Amino acid sequence: MAVITMKSLLEAGVHFGHQVKRLDPRMKRFIFSERNEIHILDLQKTLQGIKDSYELVQSVIKSGKKVLFVGTKKQASEIIEQEARRSDMPYVNNRWLGGMLSNFNTIKKSVQKLKKLEKMEIDGTFEMISKKEVSQLNREKLKLSKNLTGIKDMEELPGAVFIIDPKREQIVINEARKLGIPIISVVDTNCNPDVIDCPIPGNDDAIRSVALFTKIISDAILESDKEVGIQIVENLNEEDLMSEIAVKDEKKEL
């Protein structure tokens, strides 16, 4: 069973939002306070967002569907791939190609092309054609692989999408909403939480924070067949929380 504590969130810098001037007004309900012109997120609401997301993910997996992991920014790319692979889920961590959800049948044709090229390389076909043709096919394979490797085994639309930085991944959100696919996302203070089905208020820039959230989603998937949930331990009261925040003189990327 996954155990999440308030202290673990603090240690990962989850509570740090952006500069006050960058606030999206729709995030006000998730703000706890501000410190040095930086918004501090309400970790009680972060914990609730984690719990809701955990339950949704397990429901999706039990229904036989998959969760698509999406995070193309530098801080998220490697983490998204690692955790998606760990839980055997599809992922996009380089570039979102328009239509990956809304025009899925066309994307599947590109995936089939990639698989065909990979097979040709393995079965010796490349050895039977000219070096020029091999070079052209390798360039095509590399281009397709860069953007499609993570969804090669996604045979149907996902049951949910998990996103790091919804402000950056707006096209993903538009496509998922159009198709009625539930969206789980970490929402920082500059984001619009109203377009997210399961918003998790949190720092979407710090690597430790991104890693923590992504691991939680991956853990939910891996534990979906064990009939276990997530244990939330709220081990800090408001006074302790402010004390911890004051002690930590961390800076997030603004």
From Swiss-Prot:
GO cellular component: cytosolic small ribosomal subunit
GO annotation, biological process: translation
Keywords: Ribonucleoprotein, Ribosomal protein
Keyword Endoplasmic reticulum on entry: no
InterPro entries referenced in this protein's UniProt entry, alphabetically: Ribosomal_uS2, Ribosomal_uS2_bac/mit/plastid, Ribosomal_uS2_CS, Ribosomal_uS2_flav_dom_sf
One GO MF term attached to the UniProt entry: structural constituent of ribosome
Signal peptide: none
Pfam families noted in UniProt: Ribosomal_S2 (PF00318)
Protein family (similarity comment): Belongs to the universal ribosomal protein uS2 family.
Entry-linked HAMAP family: Ribosomal_uS2_B (MF_00291_B)
NCBIfam families: rpsB_bact (TIGR01011)
Protein name in the entry: Small ribosomal subunit protein uS2
Gene: rpsB
